[in-house]
């Protein structure tokens, strides 16, 4: 039997590619993480960009977040008890009606198979007026559509990508969340988010979860084991951070992000280094 999700919700995820909203942590616990984030932003005003990719490697409190029982129980209901967290990303929007994310499929750039479940954890209200994530039900079972990159926009997306093809946008469903709730969605689903016209920042962390049997052919990437055991060894294991923004933590983070970016930014028209705050060496190949 599922731990958190009902059998109907598990079936809905398979059919529609998402399930939401699910209560994962209390509002008080979410505010704890929000305060940690805001303290980080105050201490490191020029380094928030580092939270856009594999943030669990540089902040102990994010490593704590990805291990929340409510998050992992819901994830286990979808991909089983042996779970790796492959990536963590901050997606925050000011309440200024500007920042958005165009329609896209993460499988346009991510190459991990057979499935990546993205857990969107809300640390503030993420309702329709706040620019919540939106998705096209069932589109994860369809083809990968062609994407283009945009420039000089207010897109949240690292490559400012958008789908350059026709599809039924009228079928979109809002993944509206209250503070402490999660949406779980297949990374192949067509999804986007509008600008935030609410009264508060929209703060979401995206936690990219994969079963331990997941794989990527080349290059070999890293992930962190958050539940169960890893009998496959398809990923190197990320070290858990002991100190926020510590020297060892930043060095490990940079190595891991350079490898991941060599895939995610393959063929990109801007270097991944500039987008993710890396500091030295050459830009990842193809980026």
Residue ranges and their predicted role:
Residues 189-287:
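Non-heme Fe(II)/2-oxoglutarate
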Residues 104, 159-169, 199-201, 220-226:
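Short, surface-exposed loop/helix-turn segments at secondary-structure junctions
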Residues 100-108, 187-193, 207:
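Histidine-centered catalytic micro-motifs
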Residues 1-112, 148, 228:
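Non-heme Fe(II)-dependent double-stranded beta-helix
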Residues 81, 105-112, 121-132, 138-140, ...:
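Active-site region of the double-stranded beta-helix
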Residues 11, 128-194:
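Double-stranded beta-helix
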Residues 26-27, 91-93, 108, 126-128, ...:
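Short, solvent-exposed loop/turn segments at secondary-structure junctions
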Residues 111-128, 176-177, 184, 207-211:
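Short, conserved beta-strand element in jelly-roll/cupin
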